[in-house]
């Protein structure tokens, strides 16, 4: 079982694939989408859950998603057909950092995908290229809510605390106009869903050759979360506008 398969199984019960509950997602989209007929782009869209929810809430909205994963985009297409949204959704299989479109977008989303661009500020610079005048970016990334252990830093990378994270964004030429800091409940719910969905699949498929590896991956992830980074990791979503166009 490869990394992508594990991620698919782990997010089966939490398709937004970030530590946010449904109300938080809805509020962020309401704040980020300027009007019903807007164009929305998701860079690193995975299964397209952000776009599907935006399309369902805004009947005139048009959306595009970019992801490297063929299987994730297939899930997005299938879900769009089931919901009757396929006519307003365009999906592109390519590296999101290299994506080019013939038009600009009113909202660019990239939540939990900054690693694909080389970090938060690099993600924002990529998003800036796609923004229409007056457009907004909805970005989500991790931060340290308290001093991390060396093991946590090794595991999750060179994050900053929340004030420093926001200061860096502002220094990069962006102004926050809204945001959401994931609650401890949202963070815990996400991790329980991740580990629980993967473990349940393994237990439900004992004869599958990947079952034991999937169960081991769930156990390892749960241990790392509870023992290494649970008390230090936070997640923030920011809605940003360019400070100057």
What are these regions (language model features)?
Residues 139-158:
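Short, glycine-/aromatic-enriched active-site segment of Class I SAM-dependent methyltransferases
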Residues 97-108:
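A short acidic, Gly/Pro-enriched loop at the edge of an enzyme's catalytic core
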Residues 18-36:
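Conserved alpha-helix/loop element of class I SAM-dependent methyltransferases that forms part
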Residues 121-136:
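A short glycine-rich, Lys/Arg-flanked "PGG" loop and its adjoining helix->strand segment in the class I
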Residues 107-120:
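A short SAM/SAH-binding and catalytic strip from SAM-dependent methyltransferases
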Residues 180-245:
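Conserved Class I S-adenosyl-L-methionine
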Residues 37-46:
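Conserved class I S-adenosyl-L-methionine
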Residues 49-97:
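Class I SAM-dependent methyltransferase SAM/SAH-binding core
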